[in-house]
Amino acid sequence: MAKLHDKYQETVVAELAKKFGYSSVMQVPRIEKITLNMGVGEAVADKKVMEHALRDMTAIAGQKPIVTVARKSVAGFKIREGYPIGCKVTLRGERMWEFLERLVDIAIPRIRDFRGLSAKAFDGRGNYAMGVREQIIFPEIDYDKIDKIRGMDIVITTSAKTDEEGHALLTAFNFPFKK
C-alpha cells in the first residue's frame, strides 16, 4: 500500500471527521480518481508527436493512455472529426495513490518558480484541477529523450461536497497551497 493511503486511513479520516463533525467514517471525503489530460494539437500536422506524447504519459501515469479524438471538424484549427488531438489517463486505486505520492513529494517541488498551488482552482464541489507546464517535473521522464516540452492537466476528483472539505482533504496530504 502507498504511504499516503495508509496516512489517509490512520490519521486523515479521524481529523476530518472531527473537524466537520461527521457521524460516520463513510461521510469523510476521499480521493476517488485522478485524471491526467494532455492536449496535443500539433498531432494534426505530425503523427509522431502523438506517439511521443503517449510515451511520456505512459511513463508518468504507469498505465496506457486513451487517445482522445476531435468531436467536430474545425477549419480554423485545421482538424477534422475523428483526428487524434490528445490523450488522457484515469488513475484509481493503488496507481492513484502512488501517483499522488510522487506528485506531492517529487514533482511539485521540481516546478520552476513555484510559489504554491492556487486555492481558487476548486470547482465548487470539492474537486481540484491544476495545470503543469512541463512534463519534465516528473522523474520518470528522461530529459534527453523528450522531443518537446508539453504541459498537462491534472484533475483530482474527490467525494467532498464543498470546496472547504476538498481543501481540508488535500491539505492533509501536504498539498502546498498558497497562504
Curated annotation (Swiss-Prot):
Organism: Shewanella denitrificans (strain OS217 / ATCC BAA-1090 / DSM 15013)
GO biological-process terms attached to the record: translation
PROSITE patterns to which the protein is assigned, alphabetical: RIBOSOMAL_L5
Subunit structure of this chain's protein: Part of the 50S ribosomal subunit; part of the 5S rRNA/L5/L18/L25 subcomplex. Contacts the 5S rRNA and the P site tRNA. Forms a bridge to the 30S subunit in the 70S ribosome.
Keyword set, alphabetical order: Ribonucleoprotein, Ribosomal protein, RNA-binding, rRNA-binding, tRNA-binding
Taxon lineage: Bacteria, Pseudomonadati, Pseudomonadota, Gammaproteobacteria, Alteromonadales
Cited Gene3D superfamilies: 3.30.1440.10
Protein name listed in UniProt: Large ribosomal subunit protein uL5
GO terms under cellular component: ribonucleoprotein complex; ribosome
